[in-house]
């Protein structure tokens, strides 16, 4: 019997989590909360408009820990980080809500979104429509669908639920087969290429570059994970990739928003430093 991968363990836990949560708050109750939530802020549109101008469209991630790295940021105040990112030039935010593996929380998403005007994606492992409605009830503007965690029928069902409650969808792929499935099953314009293999957690930017020619021009390619320095950003720009999801590089910095500027808007850093002096 093979040992379950990290992703397989996370997904198994998600099914348990949905059962536990739905026993406390019914889907009907969640739907009422979702209808009463603030209007979505237009996650996909914000990224597309920025990338059209060939400017970095950065989804800046708020993440305390990960299964592969443990605790990444000790001083963790989501609202503070969100404000720092907004000042640093982020287009959107990503907030981890997975409790068991990433030390996330639903409250972190609510706190971050309340502190800024940026659209926010709920970064979690979606396996059931309940979680999609829950995301909207929490105030999220977008949800993540990970192709390697879903079959095509479930993927389509979750995307339909997202559309029903007004959420954008970011579909995440890691290889050619997953990309083909995503393009065939979903019409979302947001295609994220995770440079991290979620089964082994190894990272390679070649993943994005290899898949790029197969992503249609009417979809927005978003490179995720492994962007650590200016050379990485410039490599993507040369290949006409302008949208990024970055977490760890920012979370390890004392000032996450300033690190965002260093990576993506270096001409702004000098001005910011002068303002701080």
Curated annotation (Swiss-Prot):
Alphabetical list of InterPro entries matching this protein: Aldolase_TIM, Indole-3-glycerol_P_synth, Indole-3-glycerol_P_synth_dom, Indole-3-GlycerolPSynthase_CS, RibuloseP-bd_barrel
Pathway field: Amino-acid biosynthesis; L-tryptophan biosynthesis; L-tryptophan from chorismate: step 4/5
Keywords per UniProt: Amino-acid biosynthesis, Aromatic amino acid biosynthesis, Decarboxylase, Lyase, Tryptophan biosynthesis
E.C. numbers: 4.1.1.48
Biological processes per GO annotation: L-tryptophan biosynthetic process
Class in the EC hierarchy, top level: lyase
Reaction(s) this enzyme catalyzes, per UniProt: 1-(2-carboxyphenylamino)-1-deoxy-D-ribulose 5-phosphate + H(+) = (1S,2R)-1-C-(indol-3-yl)glycerol 3-phosphate + CO2 + H2O
Keyword presence, Amino-acid biosynthesis: yes
Gene Ontology molecular-function annotations: indole-3-glycerol-phosphate synthase activity; phosphoribosylanthranilate isomerase activity
Pfam families reported for this sequence: IGPS
Family, as annotated: Belongs to the TrpC family.
NCBIfam families: PRK00278.1-2, PRK00278.1-6, PRK00278.2-4
Protein known as: Indole-3-glycerol phosphate synthase
Organism taxonomic ancestry: Bacteria, Pseudomonadati, Pseudomonadota, Gammaproteobacteria, Pseudomonadales
Gene that encodes the chain: trpC
């Amino acid at each position: 019997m093979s040992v379950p991968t990290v992703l397989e363990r996370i997904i198994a836990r998600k099914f348990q989590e949905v059962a536990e949560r739905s026993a406390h708050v019914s889907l009907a109750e969640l739907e009422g909360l979702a209808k009463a939530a603030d209007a979505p802020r237009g996650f996909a549109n914000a990224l597309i408009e920025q990338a059209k101008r060939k400017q970095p469209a950065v989804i800046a991630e708020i993440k305390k820990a990960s299964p592969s790295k443990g605790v990444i940021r000790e001083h963790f105040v989501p609202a503070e980080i969100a404000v720092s990112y907004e000042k640093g030039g982020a287009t959107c935010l990503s907030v981890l809500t997975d409790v068991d593996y990433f030390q996330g929380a639903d409250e972190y998403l609510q706190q971050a979104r309340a502190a800024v005007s940026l659209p926010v994606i709920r970064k979690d492992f979606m396996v059931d429509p309940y979680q999609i409605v829950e995301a909207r009830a929490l105030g999220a503007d977008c949800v993540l669908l990970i192709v390697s965690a879903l079959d095509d029928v479930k993927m389509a069902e979750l995307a339909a639920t997202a559309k029903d409650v007004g959420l954008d969808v970011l579909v995440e792929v890691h290889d050619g087969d997953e990309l083909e499935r995503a393009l065939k099953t979903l019409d979302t314009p947001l295609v994220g290429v995770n440079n991290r293999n979620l089964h082994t957690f190894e990272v390679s930017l070649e993943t994005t570059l290899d898949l790029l020619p197969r992503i249609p021009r009417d979809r927005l390619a978003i490179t995720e994970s492994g962007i650590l320095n200016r050379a990485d950003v410039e490599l993507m720009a040369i290949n006409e990739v302008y949208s990024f999801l970055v977490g760890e590089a920012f979370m390890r910095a004392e000032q996450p928003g300033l690190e965002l500027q260093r990576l993506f808007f270096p001409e702004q850093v000098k001005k910011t430093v002068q303002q701080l002096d």
